[in-house]
Each structure stands twice: as structure tokens, then as C-alpha cells.
From Swiss-Prot:
Name of the protein this chain belongs to: ATP-dependent RNA helicase MRH4, mitochondrial
Keyword RNA-binding assigned: yes
Taxonomy of the source species: Eukaryota, Fungi, Dikarya, Ascomycota, Pezizomycotina
Domain text: The Q motif is unique to and characteristic of the DEAD box family of RNA helicases and controls ATP binding and hydrolysis.
Localization per Swiss-Prot or TrEMBL: Mitochondrion
Domain Helicase ATP-binding: 194-387
Transit peptide (residue range): 1-35
Residue numbers spanned by region Disordered: 38-128
Recorded catalytic activity of this chain's protein: ATP + H2O = ADP + phosphate + H(+)
Organism of this sequence: Chaetomium globosum (strain ATCC 6205 / CBS 148.51 / DSM 1962 / NBRC 6347 / NRRL 1970)
Recorded GO CC terms: mitochondrion
InterPro entries, per the entry: DEAD/DEAH_box_helicase_dom (IPR011545), Helicase_ATP-bd (IPR014001), Helicase_C-like (IPR001650), P-loop_NTPase (IPR027417)
Positions annotated to bind ATP: 207-214
Stretches assigned to the Helicase C-terminal domain: 439-576
Family affiliation: Belongs to the DEAD box helicase family. MRH4 subfamily.
Length: 576
């Protein structure tokens, strides 16, 4: 009867009448357990011993999350807590669950002592394997981090008293590259792949004005000279003979007899040559090299490098003769856009071609890269490594540009802008002589700098504009300068603008000179190209300092061009 009644009911009604618990119970128990285990295994990370490291050459990541350290809670650790600070993983062992159940692995005396003095046994256990535990704790600290802690003390001593030791963007990119180091995850370029065949490295450093390009290529050059000095056998033998001569002469100063001693084996054989377009840049680069390499004149190989005069007044063939001995291994061309221009290109090409067989590094440096120079480098140096900063061809944003329409009458007074050191640039080959005299007659200390200025006077004029030290004069010195300025003006002016210096210069002072003290630049003529805009306004606002530029616009000048340059400066865009 039951079988017949059950067979007459449809399957849908039968499944609806069956309790849900029966369906759940009918499922196999291993299915849910297996699915849970699969989900748990999918989310679980593989042990580190089973995974190969992908940073063998670079070391472990320093930003990887680390396991938090167990620290004892302080007296206020339970304040402002909403959940009890209870470790759920740590279970309290019930009494009687110790090793007593195992059949007496320890004797009764030890067990009685532990029950009577629980603290004593715990301290004894903690003191066991103390050295191994300390070693295990130190193992988690990478060796590189321990070395960094030691190196920090060296850096503090080396860089003591210096301000702004943080490298600039171009230095952060160029110095490791010139030393043969990779930056981050830098890929191997065509130049690196072709290096074993050509045995020469070629670099282009392109960065904005006042960004520290000189030190970016000068420090690796000094490092190369020191490495070459350590490997030079003739220089080592010369040092031994020199030390013996010092002992023989006793305490006699070396400067008194070094000229009579034998010449250095690398005398007049320069290992590094830096080409610059003007003599002012020669003095500047030489001063920077001596400042960062103060012992260069006392050491042998370095002394031979700097023993040549800072300026060589000779035809090109004389410089070519100096580098014909195949000793020069490094050559740097500063202001490459000028030296590869039509006026300097023939002489520069001769020097580079003559030094090319022995060169190991060729460095080109410039703040502006015209298309002509870009095409020249692509044709003659196809494997050159280009290192450029994001702000290339842009005037620093901390430099403000003002425009004055001189066609309007009356002209606003300009003496209010002379708040500090000043640079006054214009495009003619020689500024009118009446300009400095006119400023002097107004009580302003002004000088003129052009191609007819004697060279010994040029360095003296630029000293006060290239220093970072503020002008601190006593009242007596200020009064003496005032009387001297009034006497120079012929007694025309009865006033004197103290702590202010003005230089009236041509484009001679617009290239490469590190005028750190200049805060204002007045452009008498509107520049014809954006290249001139970048270099002239780049005399102010160097190394992140503030500055201001003023352009005098006449009725025949393009005001729309100046307006676009001003807008680009405000937006921080490149003048392309």
C-alpha cells in the first residue's frame, strides 16, 4: 500500500514535502571540508624558502611589511580599548597536563623544586641559549642596513659645516651613470650593449640653468683621476722617490725645492680635458675643481692634471699636441650648444677627433639643446646616453618676470628694484660707456663687463656676484664706499644706495657663470630667441633661489612674444 501511494506522487511534490535538514544531511561531509581547505590553500602564501628571489643583485625590499614586534604593554596600554587584549592563540594549559603524564621523564626532586619556586626555573630557562637567541634576532637585520648605520657617521663627519648637501635632480641621475652604476630598474641601453666593442662611453647632460651640472660631471672626473693615480706604476715609483727626497732634506718646505726635483712622469700630459667657451668659465670650473679636490696640487698625478695653466692662449694645434700622447681618457664639453655652434664647431671637432682614440668617457653638457645640436649628436654619436631633467628648457618657477613699456611717458622709477645684487644684460657687443657712469651719478655702484674688459678685471668684477655670502659692512666701510662713489661720480649725486652692486654686461655674462648672488636681471633688449631668454633670465634664481626679471619693451618689440614667455614661466612649461 505504501509503495503504491508513494509511487503515485510526483517528484516535485515529493521534494517539497521532504524536510530541508534531510537534504543537508544527505550531502557528503567531505565536500564542504575539501572546498574550505581549497579556499584556505589558495589564499595562503607559499613559504619563503620555496620562492626564488627576484632581487638578488639589488637586495631585499626595504618597504616590505614586517611582522610587528612583541612589546610589553605600558601602564596605559588598556586605555581607550573596546576589545580585551587577549591572545586567543595562546591557550592556558590545564593542571595536570604537563610531562607528569608521560611516565616521569623528570625526577620528583626537580618537579617539587619547580612547584615551590616557579620563578627560579623560568629564569634558568630564559638564560639558556642566550647567545643563539641574540644571533637569531640580529640575523633579521640586513647587512646593508647595519653598514648604512656605520656610514651615516662617516657622512656626518665628511659633510660637517656644509649646507644643502642634497644632490640636485641632474646630479642624482648623472653621477651614478658616469660612475657606471645603474639607477633603479634602468634597462640596458644600446650604449651599454655596444660598450665592449667601442670601449667608450658617451653621455649628454641636459638640465635647466643653475641646477648643478658642473659638479655632476666634475666629481666623476675627479674620481676617475684618483683611480688612475692608484693604478699608475710610474706615479707610484715617483712617489717613493719623492718621499725619500723629503726625508733627505729634513723639514725643508717642498715648495722651495720641488722645481729642482725631477718632473712628474705625467707632466704636461692631461688625463682629463674640460672645454668651455669663455675664460670666465675656465676660472669658475677650475675653482670648483680645487674646492672639491683641495689636495690636487700636492698629489702627483692630480698635480700633473692641474699643472697646466688654467687658460691656454694658443692656436688649436697646440691643444691638439697636448692630447696627442694618448693619455687623455676623459673629455667634457660644457655649454655644448655654443662649442658646437658655427663659430666654435671646427676647433671643437678637431680636438674631439684627436682625443677620440684614447677616450673612455665623453661628456656633453648644456642647458639648451637646439635641433641642430640634437641632429648632430644623433648622426655622430648614435649610442650616446641622454640624461635630461623634467624641467629642461624651462625657466625656474621661482623667477618672476615683469614687463615695462618704455614707450609710455613718464617711465616708472627703476631704483626701487635695486634691492640687492643686480645683473643688467643687453645684446650689443659693447654697452655704451655712459650707462655705468649714469648709474654711478645716481649713487649706484655699477661696473661694465664686455669683451674689451681686461681679463684680470673680469674675475674681480664677478667675485661679488658669484659668492653666496651676504654683504656685511660696518658703518665705517659703508661711509667710505659712499664717499668713494660720490667722488667717482664727480660730486653730482648727494645720495648713495648702500649694499647694492650693478653689473652692465653683454651676453658674455649670460652663459654658465654661477651668479648665485644675483636676484634681479634687467633685459634692456628683448631676446630674439627662447635660448637667449633661458640663459639671460637664468642668471637669477639659481639652485632654487628666488629671483626677478624685468624686460624693457619698446614700440618696435614683439609684446605678444614676451607675453607668451611670461605665461609659460608662470605655468612652469618649457619654452619650445
Amino acid at each position: 500500500m505504501w509503495r503504491a501511494a508513494r509511487g503515485s506522487v510526483c517528484l516535485l511534490c515529493r521534494s517539497a514535502a521532504q524536510p530541508r535538514t534531510a537534504l543537508l544531511e544527505s550531502a557528503q561531509p567531505w565536500i564542504s571540508q575539501r572546498s574550505f581547505a581549497m579556499r584556505r590553500d589558495a589564499t595562503r602564501e607559499r613559504p619563503s624558502r620555496m620562492v626564488l628571489s627576484d632581487r638578488v643583485a639589488r637586495g631585499p625590499r626595504t618597504d616590505a611589511p614586517r611582522r610587528p614586534r612583541d612589546r610589553p604593554d605600558g601602564p596605559w596600554a588598556g586605555a581607550n580599548r573596546t576589545v580585551a587584549n587577549v591572545d586567543r592563540d595562546r591557550r592556558r594549559r590545564p593542571p595536570g597536563s604537563t610531562q607528569e603524564r608521560d611516565g616521569g621523564t623528570r625526577d620528583r626532586d626537580t618537579r617539587d623544586t619547580r612547584e615551590r619556586h616557579p620563578g627560579a626555573s623560568r629564569n634558568r630557562d630564559d638564560n639558556r641559549f642566550k647567545a643563539l637567541k641574540m644571533q637569531r634576532a640580529l640575523t633579521s637585520i640586513a647587512y646593508r642596513e647595519r653598514v648604512n648605520v656605520k656610514a651615516q657617521g662617516v657622512y656626518n663627519e665628511v659633510l660637517k659645516g656644509m649646507v644643502g648637501v642634497k644632490p640636485t635632480p641632474v646630479q642624482r641621475l648623472a653621477i651614478p651613470a658616469l660612475l657606471g652604476q645603474r639607477i633603479g630598474q634602468q634597462r640596458e641601453t644600446n650604449h651599454r650593449r655596444a660598450a665592449p666593442e667601442s670601449k667608450r662611453e658617451e653621455f649628454l647632460l641636459a638640465a635647466e640653468t643653475g641646477s648643478g651640472k658642473t659638479l655632476a660631471y666634475l666629481l666623476p672626473i675627479i674620481n676617475a683621476l684618483k683611480v688612475a693615480e692608484a693604478d699608475d706604476v710610474d706615479a707610484k715609483a715617483y712617489n717613493v722617490r719623492l718621499e725619500a727626497e723629503k726625508e733627505r732634506r729634513g723639514g725643508t718646505p717642498v715648495s722651495e725645492w720641488i722645481d729642482k726635483f725631477e718632473p712628474h712622469p705625467n707632466h704636461a700630459r692631461p688625463r682629463a680635458i674640460v672645454l668651455v667657451p669663455t675664460s670666465e668659465l675656465v676660472d669658475q670650473v677650475l675653482a670648483a675643481s680645487k674646492k672639491n679636490f683641495p689636495r690636487g696640487q700636492d698629489q702627483t698625478t692630480a698635480a700633473s692634471t692641474w699643472s697646466l695653466p688654467p687658460r691656454i692662449f694658443s692656436p688649436t694645434w697646440r691643444i691638439v699636441t697636448l692630447i696627442s700622447s694618448r693619455v687623455c681618457t676623459t673629455s667634457s664639453i660644457d655649454e655644448a650648444d655654443s662649442l658646437f655652434d658655427r663659430s666654435f664647431a671646427p676647433e671643437t671637432s678637431k680636438i674631439v677627433e684627436r682625443a677620440m682614440p684614447s677616450l673612455k668617457q665623453l661628456i656633453l653638457c648644456s642647458a639648451t639643446i637646439p635641433r641642430r645640436l640634437d641632429n648632430y649628436l644623433a648622426a655622430h654619436f648614435p649610442n650616446i646616453v641622454r640624461i635630461a631633467t623634467p624641467n629642461l628648457h624651462a625657466i625656474p618657477r621661482r623667477v618672476q618676470l615683469g614687463v615695462i613699456d618704455v614707450s609710455k611717458d613718464p617711465l616708472p622709477p627703476t631704483t626701487s628694484w635695486l634691492a640687492s645684487h643686480h645683473g643688467l644684460c643687453q645684446t650689443s657687443a659693447r654697452p655704451p660707456r655712459r650707462w655705468p657712469s649714469t648709474l654711478v651719478s645716481k649713487g649706484i655702484d655699477a661696473i661694465a663687463l664686455h669683451r674689451d674688459t681686461p681679463e684680470h678685471r673680469q674675475s674681480e668684477m664677478l667675485n661679488s656676484f658669484t659668492t653666496t655670502e651676504p654683504m656685511r659692512l660696518s658703518k665705517a666701510e659703508v661711509e667710505a664706499n659712499k664717499q668713494a662713489a660720490l667722488a667717482k661720480a664727480g660730486g653730482v649725486s648727494k645720495r648713495h644706495l648702500a649694499n647694492t652692486k650693478v653689473i652692465v654686461a653683454t651676453d658674455l655674462a649670460s652663459r654658465g657663470i654661477d651668479t648665485l648672488a644675483v636676484r634681479h636681471v634687467v633685459l634692456y633688449d628683448v631676446p630674439h630667441t627662447t635660448i637667449d631668454f633661458i640663459h639671460r633670465l637664468g642668471r637669477a634664481g639659481r639652485m632654487g633661489r628666488r629671483g626677478r626679471g624685468v624686460v624693457l619693451v619698446g614700440k618696435d618689440d614683439r609684446r605678444d612674444v614676451v607675453s607668451e614667455v611670461k605665461e609659460s614661466m608662470f605655468m612652469g612649461q618649457a619654452l619650445i
